[in-house]
Amino acid sequence: MGLEVGSLCFKLKDGGLTSRTNSFKRDDTNRHQNSPKSTMERSLSFNSWEVPKETKTDSDFEVLETKKSTPNTLNGRNCERIQIKKPTVTPPEPFVFFSPRPVTELDAAATTLQKVYKSYRTRRNLADCAVVVEELWWRTLEGAALDLSSVSFFGEEKHETAVSKWARARKRAAKVGKGLSKDEKAQKLALQHWLEAIDPRHRYGHNLHFYYDVWSASKSTQPFFYWLDIGDGKDVNLEKHPRSVLQKQCIRYLGPMEREAYEVIVEDGRLMYKQGMTLINSTEEAKSIFVLSTTRNLYVGIKKKGLFQHSSFLSGGATTAAGRLVARDGILEAIWPYSGHYLPTEDNFKEFISFLEEHNVDLTNVKRCSVNEEYSSFKSTADEEEERKEVSEEVEIPSEKEERARPVFDPVKRLSCKWTSGYGPRIGCVRDYPMELQAQALEQVSLSPRVSPANSYGPIPSPRPSPKVRVSPRLAYMGIPSPRAVKC
């Protein structure tokens, strides 16, 4: 029985299409296949299909590669395994870091960088600790003030004693008084610029306090500087005070050696720099600012907003006087007692006048501007003195025995004026607070060795009596007792 296989062959002949059918028997299969005169021109088998070489172009490329293997029979048909060639991916050569410096120096540089970062992180935590303990102190004082003014003093069974009357009156009077000695007249930074001083970057306090207000209103459980830099407030960007300006404007704080270049002395009634003995000459374009330290040293420099200001000279320390001046060839022409950082009083201005007179500076033709169109930072003390007299006349003066027995709420005791340096604030002021508040603040910023669950932290207290209050009582001596004077 023969097997007839039909194959179709198409040829063009004289413009026509012809077809042929071939048939052969099974026993003649080998003979026909081996015959060079085989009439079958193309088989239906895929094995014999080949692309003519002349039809290949340069743009052709092989994507699939058919590899012949042992044919598998499936329902009488020959099946072949088709393998897909995977593309070869050559990985990039590893980058070899090359430095002319020896490996030991590179390791030392990496170690230094790590130390600098850890140091900054520690200083930021300490700054947060100072803010937190200050806020805790506010809350303690608010509670004490509430007790003093409570209606319980006027209950039927408990009458207010002369001691408590005197304590309340003294507290009231101290809010308007600035002390008696010259040291007590020294002005420290307002709250917004106190934040600037303890900030490791010394970002301009005018910008910083707007973000402080946002943090205070947020009731966040994170400390302020942590919240601002890497915490929940890192994406806060105020439209009127953008973060780009906040990060750009950083005040330069001078160290002890740098400060000497700005020290001014008086020779023959003229102001000149101690180093170089060059006379001071002010220009209309640049504003000359001055600071008189508590040690009676005068410093003068050019103001650059957001970069160099009154707080730069003493690294945020206390001042006896601060303001602006105009001088030509060392001869003083005008002085303004203006400083947004220190908010000097009229008494501070008088101290500066006294300093100039002691050094034989001719003030006859010097323009003294306490208040003008551009600057008006004076705090009048005349009305305050009258109020103090009225308060002292209204209250009963306690006896010597009662004076010794009254609670220790003494606002006269002052804290140290030196608590920061040009290379970064020393947050030693935290030690001025009671131990209990110190421990709470250290726990809040995760610097305490005590182990306490994180969920036990509540919002950072910020019980400001009014949003308008911009001065920390501990720093500006508004009459709230010093932490050293109260035992919790």
Swiss-Prot record:
Gene Ontology biological-process entries: regulation of stomatal movement
Entry's induction text: By light, cadmium and lead. Down-regulated by salt stress and treatment with mannitol.
UniProt organism field: Arabidopsis thaliana
Tissue: Highly expressed in leaf mesophyll cells. Expressed in roots, rosette and cauline leaves, stems, flowers and siliques.
Main location: cytoplasm
Bias (Basic and acidic residues): 388-403
TM regions (residue ranges): none
Residue intervals of the IQ domain: 106-135
Chain intervals for the UniProt region annotation (Disordered): 20-46, 377-403, 448-472
This protein's UniProt keywords: Cytoplasm, Nucleus
Outcome of gene disruption: Reduced primary root length. Reduced stomatal aperture.
Annotated Gene Ontology cellular component terms: cytoplasm; nucleus
Protein name: IQ domain-containing protein IQM1
Location of the protein in the cell: Cytoplasm; Nucleus
GO MF annotations in UniProt: calmodulin binding
Coiled coil: none
Presence of the UniProt keyword Cytoplasm in the record: yes
InterPro entries referenced in this protein's UniProt entry, alphabetically: IQM (IPR044159)
Assembly behavior: Interacts (via IQ domain) with CAM5.
Disulphide bridges: none
Taxonomy, superkingdom: Eukaryota
Function of the protein: Involved in the modulation of stomatal movement. Promotes stomatal opening. May play a role in the regulation of chitin signaling. May be involved in biotic and abiotic stress responses.
